[in-house]
Amino acid sequence: GTVKCPKGISVKKTSSQSGDIIRERYTFMNTTDKDIFTSLKDISIYTPFNDDYTCGAKACMTTKCHTHIWCGENISYVMCLRMGGEAPHLGLVLTEGSLSGYSVERDFEKISNDRGDFILHPSPVALVPNESFTIEWKLFWHNGKDDFYSKVNQLCNRFINVSAENFVLFSGENIN
């Protein structure tokens, strides 16, 4: 996707495919003679997942998706699920680097029917001259939530899936 970054940082994007897995790699380098410090939204990688409702209910069921994004630094993923529930679905798992957040760029004239473009943001970094860092992820097909987590565990050895019956507890409640 499109990448935006501050002046003085260059980006080199490469991609490759092995079977049904697509690997995308973004290497960012400080090309100045001064240190550069980034904040969360200084670097943006656009990931235009098709999460909108602009084509009518019937078409949305097969051609659009719900996009679930977890930016958990070095354990980050995107799980896209077709609105109709029928596989295949698209997944993305981070395999190198760190993502600390995401934002959405949308056309407000379309109101809530277009969720917009999702923009993933690498974690803030401090780069000395000629220093670089890399963001790499793998894109893959999956058959639903259970298959997604199974494939993520195969594709990324650092992935940890945390789940709980309830993520908000009140005093005296048990954690299951």
Predicted regions and their residues:
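Beta-strand-rich recognition/accessory modules
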Residues: K4-P6, S18, D42-Y46, N50, ...
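Short, solvent-exposed loop/linker segments at the N-terminal edge
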Residues: E165-E173
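Short, exposed beta-strand "edge-strand" segments with a Pro/Gly-rich flavor and a Y/T-containing core
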Residues: D33-D35, H142, F167-V168
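Acidic (Asp/Glu-rich), glycine- and aromatic
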Residues: V3-K13, Q17-H68
